[in-house]
Amino acid sequence: MPTSASASAVMSAYRATRNAQRKPVLARYEVLGYLSSGTYGRVYKAKELVANGSTTDARVFAIKKFKSDKNDDAQVLRGISQSIIREIALNRELHHENIVSLHEVLQEKTSIFLVFEYVDHDFLQIIHHHVFVLRKPIDGVVVKSLIWQLMHGIEYLHANWIMHRDLKPANILISNRGVVKIGDMGLARVYSNPLVPLYSNDMVVVTIWYRAPELLLGARHYTTGTVSYTHLTLPTICSV
């Protein structure tokens, strides 16, 4: 029977071989810029590198880099957190025109990277553009289209027993073609019927201004109401 020391040596050799065979992220993608950050990591805009290292006519992606644990200035990988596993698992199962799609998952040393399709804008940017630049409300026909597409994506999530739990303008992405994509499934959870109030068996999550009755109280309401209000009135909820 192998000893724990020999088993550890075998695993170390396996990890070394596996890591040597992996291409570094920067050998596969050229980072074009920083997009956003959150509790668990940062998101970057990147362009795919083709075989010769060129980015001509290459596809553009959004790469989410998860933060690793730090211990006295040394980064340590203490296994993959439950939230990361949940986000990866959910995104791999979701395939819908109004949900941001996951392209691939990469690991490099102590970091995990999720490579998503890139979407040009988020609704918070659209709000700011209309409030501070155009100084006029969003056209009613456009609002109807955005809300319809948003509801279409939500219907798909709920049909698969998934609750987003952090729906807000910054997580509603819009392409240059006007296609709405629901993004950031980091706080999403599979739920059951009947709906259980969030405080009964889970820590309270969701951006504070968008905490909805169905999450806090198990009520028959939905965050879409607050998001639709923002569509129609332009100010974000926190400024009301």
Describe the role of every protein-language-model region.
Residues L32-G38, V43:
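Protein kinase glycine-rich loop
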Residues Y44-K70:
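Glycine-rich ATP phosphate-binding loop
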Residues K65-L94:
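Conserved N-lobe beta3->alphaC-helix segment of eukaryotic protein kinase catalytic domains
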Residues V105:
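Activation-segment/catalytic-loop signature of the eukaryotic protein kinase fold
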Residues S111-D122:
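Conserved short submotifs of the Hanks-type protein kinase catalytic core
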Residues L146-I147:
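Activation segment signature within eukaryotic-like protein kinase domains
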Residues Y229-T236:
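Conserved small/polar residues in nucleotide/adenosyl-binding loops
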